[in-house]
Amino acid sequence: LPIYSFAQIDEEKIGSWYMYFFTADFKESQFGVQGDIQYRNWNLGGDLEQLLLRGAMSYRLPDKSAKFAFGYAHITSGAFGASNSTSSESRIYQEVTVPQKMINGRLHLNHRFRYEQRFVETQDFRTRFRYNIFVNIPLNSKEIAKNTYYIALYNELFLNGEKEIGDGKMVELFDRNRAYMGLGYAINEKIRMQAGYMNQATNTVSKGQLQFSLHQNF
């Protein structure tokens, strides 16, 4: 987020993120596409924090031990409160996701490593490193199949690649951390939905967000 977005936010007010994620593999190929649309609010709705549009080409290793993606994102960020001012960011990114199962297959993990090249309005070119560990724990089945309820957890660490971002502004190496806990339900083999709570902490601000997401595999 642009620096001004965090200037006067209300840490006690719960925000809300409404998200749609999709993946589609090309038939008889390890290649595919993936992406997401996220509408983020400073409150439960109407005070825009961010509108994020992201898409990527993907390649999965034949043994499914890792998935690589190269993509682009466009982000519109809004200021907290009554102001209608916005700023924009274009972002190129590369990522690798490594799945893992533990405890006799009952614990479903995904390790995602992402490197971003960021073109933020009014700032110099920036880069950022991200590591996210996702953990899904099925409750009524060993696999996340149709009609499965599951606990969904993740923690994502963000690190800035540069400290100087232009116009005399400085940032720390640590950018932010997101910690999430939620409940998911697999409607069928291709569609899941989740709802949960995420806390996002920077060096100066900690704010809670309700998250509602739909995940679809084509």
Residue ranges and their predicted role:
Residues 153, 162, 174, 178-218:
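Predominantly the C-terminal beta-signal and adjacent terminal strand-loop region
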Residues 26, 37-43, 72-78, 100, ...:
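Transmembrane beta-strands of outer-membrane beta-barrel pores
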Residues 20-24, 55-59, 94-100, 115, ...:
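Residues on the lipid-exposed face of transmembrane beta-strands in outer-membrane beta-barrel proteins
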Residues 12-18, 49-53, 88-92, 123-129, ...:
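Residues that define the transmembrane beta-barrel architecture of outer-membrane proteins
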Residues 1-10, 218:
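Bacterial Sec-dependent N-terminal signal peptides
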Residues 26-31, 62-65, 101-108, 139-149, ...:
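Short loop/turn motifs that connect adjacent beta-strands in outer-membrane beta-barrel proteins
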Residues 31-35, 53, 66-70, 107-113, ...:
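Transmembrane beta-strands of outer-membrane beta-barrel proteins
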Residues 8-71:
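Start-of-domain marker
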